[in-house]
Swiss-Prot record:
This is Regulatory protein E2. Residues 1-202 are annotated as: Transactivation domain. Residues 216-231 have a biased composition (Polar residues). It is found in: Host nucleus. Phosphorylated. Sumoylation plays a regulatory role in E2 transcriptional activity. There is a cross-link at residue 328 (Glycyl lysine isopeptide (Lys-Gly) (interchain with G-Cter in SUMO)). The keyword Hydrolase does not apply. Residues 207-304 are annotated as: Disordered. GO terms for cellular component: host cell nucleus.
Length: 402
């Protein structure tokens, strides 16, 4: 036991010497975390043997020593991998490779050059929140190749552009706006720049319901925002496809116009609309062309009847099936990722399943997890704004019942 105490004292002396030296090379930081790993391993072993002290040093609980040891091993392996990258020759301080910095958002990334981003909700300086962004972020891709990117800011949140050109958001301002903002608008202040709301539209607020939104028909809130932001992307329909190509807005207006004309009686000169026998529980008749409202998208839990439906009718019927994402990966990574999402007030999904696997599947990434959504738009936003676990793959699908 005396030899264990002597080794423990020697490790603590080496750790204190490194802190006082203030070295800034990656090799020295790797040596520091190797000493931290050995220190926590000794404390964990001593705690398992029933000891509460090593010399004059009180020992934490088994759970704490186990967590600290695993964290030190992870950081030590991460820095050893970084040593093989082109960024190994950069200046790396003890703060740059600290566990606290690695565990801040975005997690499992190395960060340098932090700066504040102030968000004024309702454009009120007294109703503001501070977020931290980074000049440089270092992360590994699925092939364990290191990449260096810049932390960026836009009206929606904080993000970086990965090596594939995709935006990866790690902070969204809308979640805090739901709690602290009355109007749902905010301004972003960072460095010498100010970003204001690009569009002021009542379609973002559910309290301003118009008659057109209550009528069944295609939802036009997204198309309205897109067209206001990029008016040059509109194109005029050609004469040859004027009868077959319509925008969501004109389709919604046409459906509403047909409902009115159907009520005008025989004097209007219109032929009766075609009807088909519905396959629902009521056995009634369903109008062709009645698209699902936004609240109905993803709400169907039955197999769609494919006979007697046009292509448009089939698309509208299938829009009510709840869309899914199937995640494939290791059990531990999926469980940890699910725990973070469930406890981060992330409301942009419907349900998350437990981690499960197929019977007889002995592959490395044999674990599975399902995520259900209210609509395909919600699913696309979830994929855009969330990073999946390392070495994890996903695929789209839908179920007839949840």
């Amino acid at each position: 036991m005396e030899s264990l105490v002597a080794r423990f004292d020697a490790l603590q002396e080496a750790i204190l010497t490194h802190i006082e030296s203030q070295e800034s090379t990656l090799e020295s930081q790797i040596q520091y975390w190797e000493n931290i790993r050995k220190e926590n391993a000794i404390m964990h072993y001593a705690r398992k043997q029933g000891l509460t002290k090593l010399g004059l040093q009180p020992l934490p609980t088994l759970a704490v020593t186990e967590y600290n040891a695993k964290q030190a091993i992870q950081i030590h392996l991460t820095l050893q991998s970084l040593l093989k990258s082109p960024f190994a020759s950069e200046r790396w301080t003890l703060t740059d490779v600290s566990a606290e910095l690695i565990n801040t958002s975005p997690q499992n990334c190395l960060k340098k050059g932090g700066y504040d981003v102030a968000v004024w909700f309702d454009n009120d300086r007294q109703n503001a929140m501070l977020y931290t962004n980074w000049d440089f972020l270092y992360y590994q891709d699925m092939n364990e190749q290191w990449h260096k990117v810049k932390g960026e800011v836009d009206y929606d949140g904080l993000y970086f552009t990965d090596h594939t050109g995709e935006r990866a958001y790690f902070t969204l301002f809308s979640s805090d706006a739901q709690r602290f903002s009355r109007t749902g608008l905010w301004t972003v202040h960072f460095k010498t720049q100010v970003i204001s709301s690009p569009i002021v539209s009542s379609t973002y607020s559910s309290s301003f319901d118009t008659e057109e939104q209550q009528l069944p028909g295609p939802s036009t809130s997204y198309s309205e925002v897109t067209e206001q932001a990029s008016p040059t992307r509109r194109r005029k329909p050609r004469k040859s496809d004027a009868t077959s190509t319509t925008s969501p807005e004109t389709e919604g207006v046409r459906l509403r116009r047909r409902r009115r004309e159907g009520k005008s009686g025989p004097g209007s000169g219109e032929t009766p609309r075609k009807r088909r026998r519905g396959g629902g529980r009521g056995g009634g008749e369903t109008e062709l062309g009645s698209a699902p409202s936004p609240a109905e998208v993803g709400s169907r839990h039955r197999q769609v009847e494919r006979q007697g439906l046009s292509r448009l009718g089939l698309l509208q019927a299938e829009a009510r099936d709840p869309p899914m994402i199937l995640l494939k990966g290791t059990a531990n990574s999926l469980k940890c990722w699910r725990y973070r999402k469930v406890n981060s007030n992330c409301c942009n999904f419907l349900f998350m399943s437990t981690v499960w696997n197929w019977v007889g599947d002995c592959s490395h990434n044999h674990s599975r997890m399902l995520i259900a959504f209210d609509s395909t738009d919600q699913r696309d936003a979830f994929v855009k704004h969330n990073l999946f676990p390392k070495l994890c793959t996903y695929t789209y699908g839908s179920l007839n019942s949840l």
